[in-house]
Amino acid sequence: DVKDKVDEERIESLRRTLHDFANEFYSWGFVKYDVKRIAIQLNKAKVELTREKLTEILSREFNYKPKNSGITQSVFNSTIDKIMRTLEITDEYYTKKLTQKIFSEEFKQQINNTLEKETGYVQLTIKKYVSKVYFDNDIVSKVFKSIDIFNKAIYLDDPFVLDRGPVNGVFSKVFERNAYYGHQDNLCELIYGNQEDYNLVDKIVADERLEKIMNKMQFACKGKVFFKDNREMLYKQDNVLIPFKVANLSTGLKTFAILQTLLLNGAIKDGSLIILDEPEIHLHPEWQLLFAELIVMLQKEFNFHILLNTHSPYFLQAIEVFAEKYGIDDKCEYYLSYNEHEESFVKRVTGNLEEIYAKLAKPLQVLENLRYADE
């Protein structure tokens, strides 16, 4: 929700200003428990809030009396000025800055096309709603009609994210003021940040749809992921006395462990958007078939929106076959990416997958030609 994010940004700015002011002459207890409340109050009243009203609120909340205070009138007035400037900044400006932070972190400040200096844009179309973000020199120049999306996107591209754990991952960042981080830190937060929910749901597993998925997953992931002392993530199989630390699992098993954890702790919900970047890379061919079937089952049971990228004709065919088996082939769209004249294009090839298979088969044909070249 863009409005909520903008409000969070403004409230955080107000909180920092109030924190600095309060810290001049109040205890840390006040700063910790009351400043955030005042910031929220000011943000709610921003439209009708005048300088006089703001002065009245701060004087009352901080019990500020110029003659009896150790803080000068100039410092108080400076705080009032800063708060008024913060409240006068438009939602559009905050939206722009928020978008900039997210894109800069995800793409490491390299957003625009490196081959040309033209204005670039990213467009998102959801049914009849269209949103565009324009970029010049890697800086957001305009946000056109931002869309509120209430389901968080989950991007899985690296099973080794499990090795980072909560200490080296997101928990080291949650205390940073106004921190924005990339998709792998976000994934760490979803894995390690919902431990209480995981333990609760794991005990009841009342959803028949989830049981279907877990039963199918047992063919590869024969154990269960759990947290020791709400901190360390371990993996336990029934026939093994001592549980494994997740860092010691095979790369393929880590892929299934991540999926199992996200399902059981409620991070993935009905209608979630899941982005899978070449999930077959670390999987044995037999497990590739299983993972493809799980993806199709998840879409059917939970109505997930799944964006899948693969370079494997084997894995692609598995998706195609299982989609037909489970009756969701009419929901699948297929696209082929290709380069032409130093530009990248994406072409819709639904109903004509031969184009994809032909392209993916070219390297094998090269080997075949080399093998029989001297015959």
Summary of predicted features, one role per range:
Residues 4, 10, 289-375:
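C-terminal lobe/lid and adjacent interdomain/linker elements of RecA-like ASCE P-loop ATPase modules
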Residues 277-279:
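Walker B catalytic acidic pair
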